[in-house]
Amino acid sequence: ATGQTGATAPVTFTKDIAPILQRSCQNCHQPNSVAPMSLITYEEVRPWARAIKVRTSLGPVADVMPPWYIEKDVGVQHYLFDPSLSDEELDKITRWVDNGAPRGNPADLPPSRPLGGSSLWAAGEPDLITVTEEFFVPGDAADWWGDIEMTPIGNTEDRYVASVEVHEVNDVLNADDNPADRATVGGRFVVHHMIWITQVLDDDGEIVDSTFWPVHEVGRNADTFDPEGARLLAANSRLVSDSLHLHSNGR
């Protein structure tokens, strides 16, 4: 008797697809996170099987999944935390969907990855958390670009920053008072991106220190700086948005 191997082996969720989702999708597609649906369990993934095939096989253009826009044949190709899919992984997804998206043997399912949604700090529990003002975006609102009020960081002394991470918060409830409801358009959060800096002002309101930080986009990983090149956060800094883009999520 001969077993099925290589390209002829059946592709299953537990053995083949779950590891792909864990590595490349579940950073956003988990409960209470940015994506419009969770893709953790087979029951969650199965209704989206055809959509997953389509969204992962569109090619290197905007809006493909996972969002990773590095050109495959130009420049540096080896990046930490690269979520892009290989040709082999894309082939597995296609074969799995075309074969009816079978579940497979539960024993093949890999251990689950740590889940925390938007409350999980990728770089560990922070030493300092700064909370900006709240925004309410109506369900039928047009896109908005602007600035937010200066927000005191809360540091009373100069500090070198090892890592910085921005989290969005969505506290809009559905009819059942469930903040995890995902019936939205394009995701749970209304933030698209924010260009931000920190500044120190003197008693006359004049800028005496200014530091630029990595632009924030929804789903962005924490930015960790080299120990030899950490950024200085001056005492009594304030967070200043140079440009904030908000959009409705349909709720």
Whereabouts are the PLM-identified features?
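Aromatic- and Gly/Pro-enriched helix-to-coil junctions and flexible linker segments
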Residues: A1-T151, S163-H167, N236-D242
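His-enriched metal-coordination microenvironments in redox/metal-binding proteins
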Residues: P114-R251
